[in-house]
């Protein structure tokens, strides 16, 4: 890895290398997703951990008390290190970049599905199965976004391809043809 990388990429790549060496890519994927969920769903937790007004050891104890046994020790050590170097604010970016490295190693492809209404688990599973066949992929991870502005149907973004079957696009194309 190049030495000109930014700290986020260095930390993320180090996490990835540990996961690879330990043969724990799947575990780290799960742990990184867990940390990301905590950051998004319980922001007060990382606000407390990042609060410079709190004693550093107190902040580390908060991490250990709440994450030990749930998250691999190397990831807890990373959080401790970020507390020490006053860079805990980088954690989310590091986690997302490490997930990119891990997903690439696991051959996980992400697909963005935009729909006008909430899809059921069954509908999502069927879409994923169809995409696996169409693109000859074993692992596809769907990201479902509800956007009422597309009116109906759905739009699928997979790598650099867009399959837009939204009602909004269909109507736009009809208007475009009539002009």
Curated annotation (Swiss-Prot):
Main location: membrane
Gene Ontology MF terms: proton-transporting ATP synthase activity, rotational mechanism
Pfam families assigned: OSCP (PF00213)
Compartment annotation: Cell membrane
Topology in membrane: Peripheral membrane protein
Keyword presence, Membrane: yes
Entries under Gene3D superfamilies matching the protein: N-terminal domain of the delta subunit of the F1F0-ATP synthase (1.10.520.20)
Any Gene Ontology CC annotation: proton-transporting ATP synthase complex
Domain of life: Bacteria
Ribonucleoprotein keyword on record: no
Keywords: ATP synthesis, Cell membrane, CF(1), Hydrogen ion transport, Ion transport, Membrane, Transport
InterPro entries: ATP_synth_OSCP/delta_N_sf, ATPase_OSCP/dsu
Family: Belongs to the ATPase delta chain family.
Binding partners and assembly: F-type ATPases have 2 components, F(1) - the catalytic core - and F(0) - the membrane proton channel. F(1) has five subunits: alpha(3), beta(3), gamma(1), delta(1), epsilon(1). F(0) has three main subunits: a(1), b(2) and c(10-14). The alpha and beta chains form an alternating ring which encloses part of the gamma chain. F(1) is attached to F(0) by a central stalk formed by the gamma and epsilon chains, while a peripheral stalk is formed by the delta and b chains.
Cited function: F(1)F(0) ATP synthase produces ATP from ADP in the presence of a proton or sodium gradient. F-type ATPases consist of two structural domains, F(1) containing the extramembraneous catalytic core and F(0) containing the membrane proton channel, linked together by a central stalk and a peripheral stalk. During catalysis, ATP synthesis in the catalytic domain of F(1) is coupled via a rotary mechanism of the central stalk subunits to proton translocation. This protein is part of the stalk that links CF(0) to CF(1). It either transmits conformational changes from CF(0) to CF(1) or is implicated in proton conduction.
NCBIfam families: ATP_synt_delta (TIGR01145)
PANTHER family the record matches: ATP SYNTHASE DELTA CHAIN (PTHR11910)
Official protein name in the record: ATP synthase subunit delta
Gene expressing this chain: atpH
């Amino acid at each position: 890895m190049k030495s000109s990388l930014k700290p986020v990429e260095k930390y993320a790549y180090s996490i990835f290398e540990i996961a690879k060496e330990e043969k724990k890519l799947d575990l780290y994927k799960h742990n990184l997703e867990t940390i990301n969920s905590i950051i998004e769903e319980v922001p007060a937790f990382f606000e407390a951990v990042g609060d410079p007004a709190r004693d550093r050891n107190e902040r580390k104890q908060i991490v250990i008390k709440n994450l030990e046994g749930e998250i691999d020790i190397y990831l807890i050590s990373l959080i401790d290190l970020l507390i020490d170097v006053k860079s805990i604010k980088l954690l989310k970016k590091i986690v997302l970049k490490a997930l990119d490295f891990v997903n690439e190693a696991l051959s996980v492809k992400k697909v963005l599905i935009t729909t006008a209404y909430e899809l059921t688990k069954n509908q999502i599973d069927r879409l994923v199965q169809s995409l696996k066949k169409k693109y000859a992929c074993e692992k596809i991870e769907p990201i479902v976004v509800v956007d009422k502005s597309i009116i109906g149907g759905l739009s699928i973004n997979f790598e650099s391809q867009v399959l837009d079957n939204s009602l909004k696009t269909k109507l736009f194309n009809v208007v475009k043809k009539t002009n």
